[in-house]
C-alpha cells in the first residue's frame, strides 16, 4: 500500500515516520492538534487537501506529499527534510537541523527506524498488488 500512495518515497521511510509520529495509531492526536498516522496539523491537512486526516490513506498520502516537497526543497537532504517535517520550514535555517531537542531527537529516531525497516523489510500483504 505505501508504495502506491507514497509519492515515490521508500516505504521503509514512510513506516519510520509513521512509527515515530503515531506508533502506527490511526487515531492518534498530539497535544498540538496533529492527527492520524503521519500527524498532520489542521493547517497542513487543509493545504494538502486532506479531507479526513483520520483516514489512513488520505493521511499517508498527505504526509508523503509533504515529505516529498521537503526533500525537494532541501535537495534530498533527509535529516533537514525530517527536521522541517517536525519543526516547520521556518526553523530549518543555514542547512542545519535546528537546535531544538525534540527535533534533533525526532530526526535521530526516524533515521534509526528507517535503517531498521530497510534492513528488515515488512513482507508484502497478500492483498497488496505487486
Where are the regions that the model predicts?
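Catalytic glycan-binding domains that act on GlcNAc-containing polysaccharides
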Residues: 1-130
Amino acid at each position: 500500500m505505501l508504495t502506491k500512495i507514497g509519492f515515490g518515497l521508500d516505504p521503509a521511510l514512510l513506516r519510520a515516520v509513521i512509527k515515530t509520529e503515531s506508533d502506527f495509531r490511526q487515531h492518534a492526536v498530539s497535544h498540538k492538534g496533529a492527527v492520524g498516522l503521519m500527524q498532520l496539523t489542521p493547517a497542513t491537512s487543509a493545504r494538502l487537501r486532506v479531507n479526513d486526516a483520520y483516514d489512513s490513506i488520505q493521511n499517508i498520502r498527505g504526509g508523503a506529499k509533504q515529505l516529498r516537497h521537503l526533500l525537494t526543497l532541501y535537495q534530498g537532504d533527509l535529516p533537514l527534510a525530517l527536521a522541517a517535517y517536525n519543526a516547520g520550514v521556518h526553523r530549518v535555517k543555514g542547512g542545519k537541523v535546528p537546535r531544538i531537542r525534540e527535533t534533533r531527537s525526532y530526526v535521530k529516531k526516524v533515521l534509526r527506524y528507517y535503517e531498521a525497516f530497510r534492513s528488515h523489510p515488512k513482507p508484502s500483504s497478500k492483498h497488496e498488488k505487486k
